[in-house]
Regions:
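Alpha-helical substrate-recognition element adjacent to the catalytic core
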Residues: 1-26, 37
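Conserved acidic, metal-coordinating active-site core of Asp-based
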Residues: 32, 36-38, 43-170
Length: 170
C-alpha cells in the first residue's frame, strides 16, 4: 500500500488499484490554499513535483529538511546525501498546468511550514472538503489524499480480494 492508500501493488509490484487525486480535485485544492503562503509538493509515481523557480524549489527543499533536522544549519543541510537526492529527483514546474499536461497521477499532496499556526489554519480549511482526506505525520505538515485513499479501508478491500478477513491479517 503506497501513498497512504492511493496505490496498491501485489507482491510482483503490479498495480492492482489506484486511487489518486484527480486533476480537477488537485486544481480545486490548489485554489483553496492559494491564499496561504505554504509550499505544496505533488507526489507521483514519477517523482515529486514542486511549483516555482529552481531557486524557490531549492529553498523549499531546504526548509522542509530543516523541519526534520532542526539543529542543522542551511549549510549543513545542503551537504547531506538526502538533500542531494531530493534536488536531483525533484521535478520543477512553473505552474499547475504543467503537472496537468504531464497527465501523471497525483497520489498525495504534501504541504509544510515552520509556521505551525499556518499549518493548523490550512488543515482546518481543507478538512471542510469531503472529497479529500487530510492528515499529518508531524505538526508541521499536511498530507492530502483522495477521500477513498485511506490505508485501513484499502487494506481491508485488498485482503478480502485475496480471500482473507481483517481478523486473519491483523
Amino acid at each position: 500500500i503506497l501513498g497512504s492508500g492511493a496505490e496498491v501493488r501485489d507482491p510482483q509490484r503490479k498495480i492492482v488499484k489506484e486511487c489518486g487525486i484527480g486533476m480537477e480535485l488537485c486544481r480545486e485544492i490548489c485554489e483553496e490554499v492559494k491564499e496561504f503562503p505554504i509550499s505544496i509538493v505533488f507526489l507521483t509515481n514519477e517523482g515529486d513535483y514542486r511549483i516555482g523557480t529552481e531557486k524557490e524549489v531549492e529553498e523549499s527543499i531546504i526548509a522542509e529538511m530543516q523541519l526534520f533536522h532542526v539543529n542543522m544549519t542551511r549549510e549543513e543541510v545542503v551537504k547531506t546525501s538526502e538533500y542531494r537526492r531530493a534536488i536531483e529527483s525533484v521535478k520543477v514546474v512553473s505552474d499547475f498546468e504543467e503537472i496537468e499536461k504531464a497527465g501523471i497521477p497525483v497520489f498525495k499532496l504534501f504541504m509544510f511550514s515552520h509556521d505551525l499556526e499556518l499549518v493548523r489554519r490550512v488543515t482546518k480549511h481543507l478538512e471542510k472538503n469531503p472529497k479529500i482526506a487530510v492528515a499529518s505525520s508531524f505538526e508541521s505538515n499536511v498530507e492530502i489524499t483522495d477521500a477513498r485513499a485511506q490505508k485501513g479501508p484499502i487494506l481491508k478491500e485488498y485482503i478480502e480480494s485475496l480471500g482473507y478477513t481483517m481478523d486473519e491479517v491483523m
